């Protein structure tokens, strides 16, 4: 099954996450199909906190990809803010 979930990057005590489309059997930070955005939980000042390529996200959702709970919440919050 294809899923849309967060993949962790960044450094110690300063996380950064990519929204990735991946096979659900792969590891969290392993091989992915496509990156469709990012989430920076520790963004300060003018730094961008969340970016989602909505066109690609909608494409993958139409193909049957399942969002993780956290990604679904982020998408919902981004839609409300826009």
Curated annotation (Swiss-Prot):
Keywords: Ribonucleoprotein, Ribosomal protein
Pfam families according to UniProt: Ribosomal_S16
Molecular function per GO: structural constituent of ribosome
UniProt cross-references to SUPFAM superfamilies, sorted A to Z: Ribosomal protein S16
GO biological process, one term: translation
Ribosomal protein as UniProt keyword: yes
GO cellular component: cytoplasm; small ribosomal subunit
Domain of life: Bacteria
Protein family per UniProt: Belongs to the bacterial ribosomal protein bS16 family.
NCBIfam families membership: S16
HAMAP family: Ribosomal_bS16 (MF_00385)
Protein name: Small ribosomal subunit protein bS16
Classification lineage: Bacteria, Pseudomonadati, Pseudomonadota, Gammaproteobacteria, Cellvibrionales
